[in-house]
Amino acid sequence: AKYNSIPESNFGVAVFDTLYLNDEKAIPQPRLALSYKLVNETTWEFPLRKGVVFHNGTPLTAKDVKFSFDRALDPQTKTFFFPFISTIKEVKIIDDFTIQIITNGPDPLLLKRLSFSLFVFPADLFKEKGAEAFFRNPVGSGPFKFVSWTRNDRMVLEANEAYWDGAPKVKRVIFRPVPEVATKI
């Protein structure tokens, strides 16, 4: 899966983390980013949360964030999220735990745009496996770990006990596809 639809995005939010995510009132809340600072009208600086690890034990750093944005901004990727981040011109690494996002012009809605679930992938693992193999057995830093996928039947996730925001109360989640729109809930 490339996470190019809303149902896939819901699965993605469980397995991966984002810089910001909307709360129940649709207000962007920091996740992997701790905060932001406007350097100038087109440059936003984000310190990243330290101590976050991917499910394979690899620490999450600015390199992973930049890789994930660069991938999503590449027109060849054809990601579902591109329209939300198309105002981004460049992502720069300042240090291991700080990035800058440079936009094409002033973008007062950038935090809202970042809250539409641009997932952060482990750069080295993604490059090593390639997109197709990575998405068959995804590794994220989110509250749930990928366990298995049976095509047209189910995706199984288990709680990430080492999640930076506390282990989920639910220990196992099963996503089942419902092909008929009329029967979806």
Tell where the protein language model's regions lie, with residue ranges.
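A structural "hinge/loop" feature
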Residues: 1-9, 32, 58, 80, ...
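Gly/Pro-rich hinge or "lid" segments in bacterial periplasmic/extracellular proteins
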Residues: 23, 27, 115-168, 172, ...
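Short, hydrophobic alpha-helical packing/hinge segments within bilobed ligand-binding/sensory domains
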Residues: 68, 184-185
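Aromatic- and charge-enriched surface segment that lines or borders ligand/interaction sites
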Residues: 34-78, 94, 100
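A local structural motif
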Residues: 44, 99-101, 165-176
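Surface-exposed binding/hinge segments that line
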Residues: 37, 82-125, 148-150
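Sec-exported extracytoplasmic/periplasmic mature domains
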Residues: 20, 24, 41, 53, ...
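N-terminal lobe/hinge region of extracytoplasmic solute-binding protein
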Residues: 1-40, 70, 139-140
